[in-house]
């Protein structure tokens, strides 16, 4: 009889322990989701505020705000070798250089498609080299992750070119902004 009460007592303890474990796991996972969502919403709010600062601001401006008649697109070669003022003086139209160091064909095609969706520039100067088509970087879209949910061209390119596990990770807002922070 003593053995029997021990067995029934251990089942009760086991059920309570399993319930406690389940509740703890649920609370931890819920906390992670809430923190991820809160940080993501904060970063979504902050990104347009820095649209005039640094490389991240330049990318945001390129995707959403640029509206000059002449747009210069490319990687670091276009970024450093095209002087916007000289292009404006020789063509007689305002120009903006959206080229960014380390951003090659896949990145630039998202930028150009976003620009063409908003308006039709009179001239797009697109600097490409052979090595830009076969970029050696592991992830050509890392600078575009923050725009995964908000830009249809970025979303389509990431889903088309990257493995499924990479864009599955982009469901996390913190992961999207990891390249920016």
Regions found by a protein language model. Give the residues of each.
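N-terminal Lys/Arg-rich, disordered targeting/topogenic segments
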Residues: 1-19
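Hydrophobic membrane-insertion alpha-helices, especially the h-region
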Residues: 20-41
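Acidic/glycine-enriched edge-of-secondary-structure segments
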Residues: 38-50, 94-102
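Alpha-helical transmembrane signal-anchor/signal-peptide segments
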Residues: 41-61, 66
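Residue-level preference for short coil/turn positions at secondary-structure junctions
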Residues: 66-67, 120
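Membrane-embedded segments
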Residues: 73, 77-162
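Extended, charge-rich helix/loop segments that form flexible
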Residues: 158-181
